[in-house]
Amino acid sequence: MGLPWYRVHTVVLNDPGRLLSVHIMHTALVAGWAGSMALYELAVFDPSDPVLDPMWRQGMFVIPFMTRLGITNSWGGWSITGGTITNPGIWSYEGVAGAHIVFSGLCFLAAIWHWVYWDLEIFCDERTGKPSLDLPKIFGIHLFLAGLACFGFGAFHVTGLYGPGIWVSDPYGLTGKVQSVNPSWGVEGFDPFVPGGIASHHIAAGTLGILAGLFHLSVRPPQRLYKGLRMGNIETVLSSSIAAVFFAAFVVAGTMWYGSATTPIELFGPTRYQWDQGYFQQEIYRRVSAGLAENQSLSEVWSKIPEKLAFYDYIGNNPAKGGLFRAGSMDNGDGIAVGWLGHPIFRDKEGRELFVRRMPTFFETFPVVLVDGDGIVRADVPFRRAESKYSVEQVGVTVEFYGGELNGVSYSDPVTVKKYARRAQLGEIFELDRATLKSDGVFRSSPRGWFTFGHASFALLFFFGHIWHGSRTLFRDVFAGIDPDLDAQVEFGAFQKLGDPTTRRQAI
């Protein structure tokens, strides 16, 4: 046939049987990739430390999606929340992966069957004897089935009526677990961070889809609309399908990057805005202030800060710190977190508490500046020693740790103080193992960053595809160079003067 690579899909034009076949094969490839990727991730995943080495630090991509839908146990005897289990059941991580691979194999066989047996009676228009598809009817069927699945997910799976529920956590990602969710029918259901909105919106959208599907099955489109939107052309279906997909891709890119109830930080890592706004730092200080108000010592209150909360307050977990071509997991960058060293409190020789200015997201290097409670600069690590006025040596800065592994330890020698001041720029200080994975010390992004980048990129690409195929189907006659009135113009007797549409003969 000699088709160029960008026109190979014309082989399934006007061939409904093989059009169905290639779509089934595509489903086989997608399901096969998902199952295989899940098995690969399970082979390399280390579940031993869900606090300091969670799935998102290890670069897991499909495990978080399984987990948010209610899968938490493995046939390997471990649970995602830590600890061991004896009876994981069939719907474990491996069970879901296996189901996808089996489904992929069945789709593969079905695709081959439909490719061989393409000329089925069901695809034949009995009036013309030619292959054709009733596209508005197919649209109604698909809309009805999609609505049914959407309603079922919201009403049964999410609510726990028949299913496990979904992953739900607190605002600081500390107490997450799989649980059933009640639908939120009030205005709070529109809050993207309220899990109840997931149930209610799926129920509402599913109901709408079912009703719309029944409408399109029972009502035929008006002839003018049918012709105007080219409803008989399969490329119209392609164009509108691409529109639905790119719109969905833009939406999920947004919910992933900015955060929502559907993208919990325990599964995908924190967002960059939580670092920018000092979200976890504020919560830590709130807890410390509450403890001090109850006459607890600094050592006591900082020792009660959960290691998980402190770990979120570290710039290495910011998904925007990864570079565009830095492949690999976060653990391959700054290393595997081993333990929290504690919170460093810096003081000058006059006893003032000093705070290290934190590094903004888009800086690779940043000056070490220590300010007091009023924001006045009191100490720094100068670029030129000859010009310095506020150097650690001159100001006499000391550091003492509270909580963590160095609880109660203090340092006064300038070299050590400057070392911890530099590290305090990056948030809470952790001991990181860079030897095990030969980590290079350069920050990586989390799956949150990869997902956003991938879906935003493909959304832009698919937007172009929608415009392209929409234009092709709407202006097919123009692109083909065929004027719809051409036959009328050359027909003998249609016009009093040949080719002049203003002299059209009137029918008597």
UniProtKB/Swiss-Prot annotation:
Please give one Gene Ontology molecular function term for this protein.
chlorophyll binding
Sorted alphabetically, the keyword list is:
Chlorophyll, Chloroplast, Chromophore, Membrane, Photosynthesis, Photosystem II, Plastid, Thylakoid, Transmembrane, Transmembrane helix
- InterPro entries found in the cross-reference section: PS_antenna-like, PS_II_antenna-like_sf, PSII_PsbB
Q: Does the keyword Chloroplast apply?
A: yes
Task: Report the source organism.
Answer: Helianthus annuus (Common sunflower)
A Pfam family that this protein carries is PSII
How many cofactor units bind, and how?
Binds multiple chlorophylls. PSII binds additional chlorophylls, carotenoids and specific lipids.
UniProt family annotation: Belongs to the PsbB/PsbC family. PsbB subfamily.
Fill in the subunit field for this protein: PSII is composed of 1 copy each of membrane proteins PsbA, PsbB, PsbC, PsbD, PsbE, PsbF, PsbH, PsbI, PsbJ, PsbK, PsbL, PsbM, PsbT, PsbX, PsbY, PsbZ, Psb30/Ycf12, at least 3 peripheral proteins of the oxygen-evolving complex and a large number of cofactors. It forms dimeric complexes.
Name its cellular compartments. Answer: Plastid, Chloroplast thylakoid membrane
Functional description taken from the UniProt entry: One of the components of the core complex of photosystem II (PSII). It binds chlorophyll and helps catalyze the primary light-induced photochemical processes of PSII. PSII is a light-driven water:plastoquinone oxidoreductase, using light energy to abstract electrons from H(2)O, generating O(2) and a proton gradient subsequently used for ATP formation.
- Topology within the bilayer: Multi-pass membrane protein
GO cellular component terms, A-Z: chloroplast thylakoid membrane; photosystem II
Residue ranges crossing the lipid bilayer per the database entry: 21-36, 101-115, 140-156, 203-218, 237-252, 457-472
Question: Does the keyword section mention Plastid?
Answer: yes
User: In its UniProt entry, what is this protein called?
Assistant: Photosystem II CP47 reaction center protein
The record's annotation in HAMAP family points to:
PSII_PsbB_CP47
Q: Name its GO BP terms in alphabetical order.
A: photosynthetic electron transport in photosystem II
